[in-house]
Amino acid sequence: MKNWRLNNVTESAFEKTGPIPRSIAKTFEKFKKELEPNSESEIIEEFRVSRYQTASSIKYLVLLVTVPLLINQASKSLVFSPFIDYFWNDNQSDIFLNESQEERAFSELQRFEEKIHFEILIGQSPPLSQETIDKEIKNKAIELAQFYVQESTDAIKNLLADILAFITFAYLIFTGGRQIAVLKSFINELIYGLSDTAKAFLIILFTDIFVGFHSTHGWEVVLENGLRHFGLPENRDLIFLFIATFPVVLDTVFKYWIFRYLNQVSPSAVATYHEMNE
């Protein structure tokens, strides 16, 4: 890597905010450079740096996404899956990891039995003997048992594979100092290059998704699926407590960020945001 490239990227990536908004300062600096005699060579130099930043950032982003995913899937299929399946099937008699799985299984079995009786009563199914009904219920119970055994083993595999993928991701972040600086500079340039309307639109979209009026339903779905993914009990009190506190904290942090940082960097974007949000 050339030294001029790294120095340029590092200065841009860790540039501090001053009393003058960065959008105004960057515009004035750009106008000043265009008046200099060697402005043409500097423009070519900046274009090369920008092209290098874009290519390097995209490669690093692809690396951050694909490598942990590949590690996750490979370890889950080739390492954890055979070991856990062998241990669970041969040495473990339990079907469920938690009470939430039991409640769902019992509810499905009860609904299946009620469906059989309902179809017989309305004439959609021919009358069945109690022995036949018990046999169908038993087959359904065996099917549910196999399903929840698979769900339990998958949850353990998911936990171990995700931990390994997280360690891989953290290692890539920890060892990618130069790439992180380039990526940060690229993201800054990408954000500052957006129009004020686009910035305000993204801010409103982000806040409405994560801390908006309807965000509680989304958080509930995410938490339930996350707990189920790792085989943890779906505690409704814990879920509702999280929904009642975390979006509020996130909204407070976001408003502080607008007041403390974005108002200095791009005050016009903040003004546009307030106008669009009214």
UniProtKB/Swiss-Prot annotation:
One of its GO terms (molecular function) is antiporter activity. Pfam families: CemA. Keywords: Antiport, Chloroplast, Hydrogen ion transport, Ion transport, Membrane, Plastid, Plastid inner membrane, Potassium, Potassium transport, Transmembrane, Transmembrane helix, Transport. It is a multi-pass membrane protein. It is found in: Plastid, Chloroplast inner membrane. It catalyses: K(+)(in) + H(+)(out) = K(+)(out) + H(+)(in). Coiled coil: none annotated. GO terms for biological process: potassium ion transport. GO terms for cellular component: chloroplast inner membrane. The chain crosses the membrane at residues 60-80, 163-183, 201-221, 239-259. Contributes to K(+)/H(+) antiport activity by supporting proton efflux to control proton extrusion and homeostasis in chloroplasts in a light-dependent manner to modulate photosynthesis. Prevents excessive induction of non-photochemical quenching (NPQ) under continuous-light conditions. Indirectly promotes efficient inorganic carbon uptake into chloroplasts. Belongs to the CemA family. This is Potassium/proton antiporter CemA. It comes from Guillardia theta (Cryptophyte). The lineage of its organism: Eukaryota, Cryptophyceae, Pyrenomonadales, Geminigeraceae, Guillardia. The gene is cemA.
